[in-house]
């Protein structure tokens, strides 16, 4: 009777629970570093790439996959893949803060108040277009503009994210467009496109923030990978995490990088 998401992104109910078995198990590690333990008879819907770049699907057991990987040469056409699930199909809900504006604050906002620091005038225009007003520039005129977004501090506090930045579950379960707006606010303020890797990247110094972004991206049907990296600031080197992903023609920016020629995944 519990509700879960199916591979199409729709909510469905659990109709049956299998018995407990004591079968041989395999640990499967995916190319993004995540692992899962499954018994040898578990059936997987596997995709193989064709020469024309389309995919064919077959059902294989865990044991079948293990034998396949041992016996077959490693080519792009012989590596079994589990295709991404579709974006979560959820209704639009009322949110206390516009998701794009919240994304901007999570990306470039002061954790203790409603101030956002940004150099791009189009970001400010987009925030204003969404019905928000802000104060004058608080910077020294030599750096990015710092402006207070009015009437969001209390809402940030009510969401429990003031002085504690994270993506609230309420936003993780909003509609597709609302979740995409949230991602675009984050990317417009704190993301970039890596030209040589042909990947979209957002970096953070907090691992749990990287995991938050990974969750958000996955709800949009996009596969992302987290890399631990060394970051440098003011001559000091410290640990950080980059969340990297590609898309099938979807630009995760809204007002920035509209002219980049990125390949589909």
How would you describe each model-predicted region?
Residues 234-265:
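Polar, glycine-rich mid-to-C-terminal structural blocks
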Residues 1-10, 15-236, 242:
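Intein-associated homing endonuclease modules of the LAGLIDADG/DOD-type, together
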């Amino acid at each position: 009777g519990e509700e879960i998401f199916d591979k199409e992104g729709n909510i469905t109910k659990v109709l049956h629970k299998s018995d407990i078995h004591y079968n041989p198990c395999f640990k499967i590690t995916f190319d993004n570093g995540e692992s899962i333990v499954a018994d040898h008879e578990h059936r997987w819907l596997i995709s193989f790439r064709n020469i024309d770049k389309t995919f064919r699907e077959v059902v294989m057991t865990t044991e079948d996959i293990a034998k396949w990987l041992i016996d077959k040469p490693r080519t792009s056409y012989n590596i079994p893949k589990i295709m991404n699930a579709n974006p979560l199909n959820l209704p639009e809900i009322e949110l206390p803060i516009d998701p794009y504006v919240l994304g901007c604050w999570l990306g470039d906002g002061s954790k203790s108040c409603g101030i956002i620091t940004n150099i791009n005038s189009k970001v400010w225009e987009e925030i204003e277009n969404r019905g928000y007003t802000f104060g004058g520039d608080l910077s020294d005129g030599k750096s990015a503009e710092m402006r207070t977004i009015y009437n969001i501090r209390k809402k940030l506090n009510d969401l429990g994210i003031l002085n504690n930045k994270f993506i609230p579950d309420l936003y993780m379960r909003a509609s597709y467009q609302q979740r995409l707006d949230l991602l675009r606010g984050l990317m417009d303020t704190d993301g970039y496109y890596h030209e040589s890797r042909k990947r979209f990247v957002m970096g953070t110094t907090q691992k749990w923030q990287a995991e938050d972004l990974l969750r958000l991206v996955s709800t949009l049907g996009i596969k992302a990978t987290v890399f631990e990296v060394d970051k440098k600031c003011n001559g000091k080197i410290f640990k950080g995490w980059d969340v990297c992903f590609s898309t099938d023609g979807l630009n995760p920016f809204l007002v920035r990088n509209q002219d980049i020629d990125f390949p589909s995944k």
